[in-house]
Amino acid sequence: MMVFQSFILGNLVSLCMKIINSVVVVGLYYGFLTTFSIGPSYLFLLRARVMDEGEEGTEKKVSATTGFIAGQLMMFISIYYAPLHLALGRPHTITVLALPYLLFHFFWNNHKHFFDYGSTTRNEMRNLRIQCVFLNNLIFQLFNHFILPSSMLARLVNIYMFRCNNKMLFVTSSFVGWLIGHILFMKWVGLVLVWIQQNHSIRSNRSNVLIRSNKYKFLVSELRNSMARIFSILLFITCVYYLGRIPSPILTKKLKGTSETEERGGTKQDQEVSTEEAPFPSLFSEEREDLDQIDEIDEIRVNAKEQINKDDEFHIRTYYNYNKISENIDGNKENSNLEFLKIKKKEDSVLWFEKPLVTLIFDYKRWNRPNRYIKNDQIENAVRNEMSQYFFSACQSDGKDRISFSYPRNLSTFSEMIQKKIPSFRREKNPSDQFSTCWSLINEEKKENLKKEFLNRIEALDKEWSVEHILEKTTRFCHNETKKEYLPKIYDPFLHGISRGRTQRLFPFQIITKTYLKNPIGGSWINKIHGILLNINYQKFEQTIEKFNRKSSAIKKNLSFFSDPQEEKYKSEEESKIFKFLFDVVIADSNDQTLIKNFMDFHEIHKKVPRWSYKLRSDLEELEGENEETIPLEEPGIRARKAKRVVIFTDTEPHNEIYTNLKNNKNYDQNDEMVLIRYSQQSDFRREIIQGSMRPQRRKTVIWEFFQANMHSPLFFDRIDKFFFFSFDIRGLTKQILRNFMRKNEKKKLDKKDAERSKRKEKGRLKIAEVWDSFFFAQILRGFLLVTQSILRKYILLPLLIIIKNSVRMLLFQIPEWSEDLKDWKREMHVKCTYNRVPLSETEFPRNWLTDGIQIKILFPFYLKPWHKSKFHSSQKGRLKKTKDKGKKKDFCFLTVWGMETELPFGSAHKQPSFFGPISKELKKKMKKYKTKSFQVLRFFKERDKIFLKGAKEIKNWIMKNFVFIKGKRNDLSKGNRIPLLGLREIDELTETKNDSITSNPIIHELSVQNRSMEWKNSSFSENKIKNSIDRINTIRNQIEAISKEKKKITNSCNKPPYDSKIIESSKKKWQIVKSKNTRLIRKTFYFVKFCIEQLSLGIFGGIINIPRIITQLLFESTKQIRDKSIYKNEETQEKINKKKNTIYLISTIKKFKSNKKKISYDLCSLSQAYVFYKLSQLQVSNFSKLRAVLEYNICVTSLFVKNQIKDFFQEHGIFHYKLKEKTFLNSESNQWKNWLRSHYQYNLPEIVWARLVTEKWKNKINQDSLVLNQSLNKEDSYEKNQFDNYKKLNSFEADSLLNPKQNLKKDYIYNLFCYNSINSKETIFDMPLDIIIDNFLVSSFRGKSNIRGIGKFRTRKFLDWRILTFWFIKKVNIESAVDTTSKKKNIQTQAQNSERIHKITKTGLANQKKDFFDWMGMNEEILNYPIANFDFLFFPEFVLFSSTYKIKPWVIPIKLLLFNFNEKKTVNKKITRNQNVFIPSNETKNLRFYNLTKESADQGELESDNEKQRNPELALPNQEKNIEENYAESKIKKPENKKQYKPNTEVELDLFLTRYSRFQLRWNFFLNTKILNNIKIYCLLVRLKNPNEIAISSIERAEMNLDLLMIEKNFTFAKLMKKGILIIEPLRLSVKNDGQLIIYRTIGISLVHKNNHQISQREKKKIEKAITKYKKKTVNRKKKNSDFFAPENLLSPKRRREFRILICSKFKTKSTRYRNSRFDKNIQNCGQVLNQKKDLDKDKTNLMKLKFFLWPNFRLEDLACMNRYWFNTNNGNHFSMIRIHMYTRLKINS
């Protein structure tokens, strides 16, 4: 029951998965998604829903809905139907259909009778309104959707259309899905409208609110009535929107097209993508087909710069003589070619009227200009993007049509051409099932026939028949069976290898000289098939025949149609008939019976690629000036980013060597310019768009600001800075608040404010610059204004100010400063700069400065000063302040349009130092001094006033005392003479009481006296005192009554002094001072006026008297300067003489110091070394032995502390050794312990001593482990050289397979491991630290079995360190001779010697070798011993250990294909000279090496071809075999040739660098960009100046020029640059077009047999035959079933052998088996059986024998390609899944 339930659940899940993945469901899903792609058609649909009411309204709704659905149905049909898709997808559909209809509809809607919606009595079908509504919705639905664009949806639909089989079902289901979505959407819209109409609250409340005010009274009614107007406005917006998208045919400039060429023509101006074909492909040979299949990589030919005359167009095209009538085998004559020509003319005449209409309406080239231009780097013309990178075609495999991704391109092109020309060639497609059954039957029949044939041959072998009956013969092309006459082997399509001859080609950088074309060009054989297929012009062909007779030398290429034929005679008439059938002879020579070596070029089959018919160039190319030679000067067609050409430096004096080599070149420009391209800061809105072309809107870009730095999509809205209203990032806000709350340091806030302020300034500056850039004539206007402002400032304004200033000084009786001002004025320089601020010179204007712009930089700007300070009065404090502000001060500025000065162009004007500022400062100082003096006088008078007041006070006190005495006396008198009256007594009493009150309060009386005394002006204090005393008695008497009344009111407040008493006292003092000053001033005015008059007269007469004194002083100074210059020159010459005498200046200063008797304190801290060594130099040299030993062996110590001058001196005198000089150690920072070890010299043993210490056992182990590695070091890439040594060692592979069965079994295991482990290989980083000592590193790499040779330690580094590549495979030339001399000996000896030589490459030798510009890539030394697997085995590390094993049998794996290291050896023929226009630098010792194909090993096939040569010795070519053997010997003994060397040219070095090492990118380190650019700008100015010393010194003082970045060393290598951090080199993975096919090519290259490696020389073949015959004699008496013959399948030919393998391992009738590919998860039909490998092979001897018979180990890898092609029934490059086959099926023979 449980099983049943699980079964039901599994079925349900599978059923659900099938339903979900079905075509119908997916189509419904995609169709439902397209509902949301809202377009302008919804406007009319909603308009009909909203506005129309009544019967006519319902009819309009129905018509709108039907039109809408019909339009969408057309769109869905266009997905499936290609013509409709092309018609609707073109942008011109909008032009033709949309815009006129939209405009008509818009103006029709605005008609006055448009709103008349009354019912009509006409027939409904005749009602135009309903039809217009239908047409509106139909046409609008065809337009592109714009509110919610569905580009991604369309791509998904296209992808699924490609995948699914039932496409029509998918289209219909998607339409149904759209219909469902549309119905739901419209129902939702209808419900919303009904809800709005029925909802009373919305209608009443909102309307009441609006109606309350009179202003909005009729708004609702107006809105309801003007719905049609709103829709018409929306329609107008769509019209304007589409206006921007249409390609307007008006006002477009027609492009200048390239020359009209034929569809398959071959001129170099055609610039088509052509597939390079083999010279004569043998379509009948399967092996040849495999190689052709791989070799068909796109070779793109761009020869736009080589314009060829029309007379020389014959050299690529294949020609046919139409005048001569062809002759068939039957002898019938026909004029077939002329018939083809007539048919072609008829077709052209029929189509003449169709072309203008199509190009007018639906031209994809947009009348005159295309829609968009996508530039291809390798093709000058614009190839349209319909061209695919890879080629695939349908082919029949396993009886069914399948897509082959490696289909031969030329084969498909050839079949297309044949089908066009010959209608009968077209095949009718049979049903797939019928064809598959027929195919399986044919294969079964083939298999049975091959079985029988194979069994018969084995039986013949058992019966010991002759070899002719056993081995299969090679098929030959025979034309007479009775006479057994065959075609010559050169032309036999069934043959291959050496019998087909060789192809000679000229390599790059070479041309054909006159000696090469010495032989007359005779008759040529031309293929008749090419003549049938290609269109040939008679007149051109006749001209070519005449050129052959004139011995024309216009052939640029030497690709001959046939490959080096031998001179042979025709033997019979039948042979000539067959040749006449295949070929026609152009008789241009009397010797028509011979074949000449040199032939005319053949036509390569071309494929017409979709491309534009014109040639355009971009703005950038115009700025770079690359295409000036080829294209006439016209405006660039492609718009690029705004850029300007900045000329940094123009070299008017080129190098003499280069100039003499290039003087014959007419296009050579003597003014070599260094140019930078400066891009604008604004956004790139016009990238790669052709000028005048249409602008398809970019849906993904939105413009946010007026000046936007970078364009970006709204998808990145969350990453940009937004307003607070748009920002919803709460987490970021909280972070920012907390950060601001926690931040305590206010300095950071200030820095941030400064940075923000500088950013704002920079943005403002850029805005101004972009405004100047945006207008057309703005730069011209600005340039003229700047130049006029510069002239006005320099020559008018500043001299005028100087004159005014000095004249005013003369009027003020001061000394004029003419010389100082003129000196400062002359120092000011107006340097003309480029728009990018690169300074040129004062007189030189930048190129195109009116259009590109100009900047004027003012160096040492002149500021008018009221006076000049003397230099001697500057104090130490002033000096310190000056040095502190030196870096901040800038002695330059830029001129603005208004004549102001700015620090940067387009910046804000900074304030100039004012002229009156120092004057006001000086006046303030003088006023301060005057004030201090006046205050001193006042202080003196104040002290005097104090003394005077003190005396007056003492007088007052004396008077008061006297007054009290007199008063007492008077009282006494009054007491003595009393009058007896009552009144008087009472008065006395009152006076007594009053006196008591006066004594108690004396201050009041004094104040009253003081107040009264202030009123009295001209009276003294003493006189008033007496009067006051008398009057007081009277007043007291008068006031007795008042005092008695007020006595009660008196309080304690009367006792306090009043507040104003102190103020009155101070004012009194001031008044007295002022009064005294006035009197003094009146007295001294006369003397002051007299003093002023005297000073004026003295100033005038003093200035007149001082004029001759100033003149004499100037003369004295000029003579002193001249005298100082002469003294300085004498000192310089004396210094040069002293340098020649090798004197030490430090020691001479000590001598001067001793001789000088004056007591002057010198600082001898810097002279301590010199003093010590001076004392040592006075001693004898013999006493230096100990010191020399110490200093020599402690180099690390002495070189760091001893000065260079002292070391140079002692080195020249022989006192010290030269090693005392300073050394640059490798990585001294990280290797300090190594430097310490170097200082301990007793442990630094020489290499010979180290070699003795190594034990023999360890050495042998190293040599055994490094056997594989040293084979590659023996002779690089020479397959032939190793063959002899390997055959001598192993006695050939056949004998070895017979004699050493155990070793062969071990090899089989290695082969299996080689195949299976490559799948599970892990990626490893190719990296090695530079710090490891190379001797130990190499030894450890040889001892340990690392994955990649030369790698011991792995470090986590992201890029490949190129420095490690120079330590191993680059050797010196002195090692080369030793390797070449030992190459004659046995292989084992060379291995041992080479391994020792590897250990002898030391680190110091590499560090001290001479380095040049391209030394880091190894371009200066010849690569002698290049390891084979150095680069390609990075992908397959496990292949390294087995590479030598495969190299022993080079026919198994083509190492040249897999391990191609791009180092080909160049052998130069005597008859071929190098092109004189190309120079290779002297440092590069020709490591671009090309193989000479004539010296490769001859291609003879396998062992059967050798046996065939024994049977048919007349077929062999002994002369060629001798040449091959001689080439073997030459390649071994050959030494490098001394070639002519040229001096390096910068352009050639750059070209070599880019072509060979284009995968490396050089970039500056980011923090050095500004420094280096600033240095470059200063260099540009200094180069142009005659006396650059002053400006150089000032720029160094201002820290503008960095001396650390100066290239002081001449030979500055990349290693040092990288150490300093100036350059960083990172590998850049470029997407090269051929890379994908090269990877496939190399993957299959493992499994392909390279024919050059099949060749066995005659000597080795004899040895193999001897070994086989000896072994046969030994095994005669053995049983036949245990016969140990190496491989029975070798009885068959190679082609039949592979066919037999595949047929025997396949069952063609069973179709049920399936192979599931786990990598791509696809079900691929499989017809092969997979047998598991048995584990007990070693136990069972019979199984072992069967394995040896039928495993075929020497052809194991060859079968891998066949497995992919035949067993998996696919050709799609999934080459790693084929290694899943563990074992081949065994051959089952039924006895």
UniProtKB/Swiss-Prot annotation:
Ligase found in the keyword field: no
GO terms, biological process: protein transport
Predominant place of localization: plastid
Residue ranges of the region described as Disordered: 257-278, 1498-1521
InterPro entries tied to this protein: TIC214
Subunit-structure text: Part of the Tic complex.
Family, per entry: Belongs to the TIC214 family.
PANTHER family tied to this protein: PROTEIN TIC 214, PROTEIN TIC 214-RELATED
Function: Involved in protein precursor import into chloroplasts. May be part of an intermediate translocation complex acting as a protein-conducting channel at the inner envelope.
Other remarks on this protein: There is a partial copy of the N-terminus (positions 1-367) of ycf1 in the inverted repeat (BAF49901).
Protein's recorded name: Protein TIC 214
Origin species: Aethionema grandiflorum (Persian stone-cress)
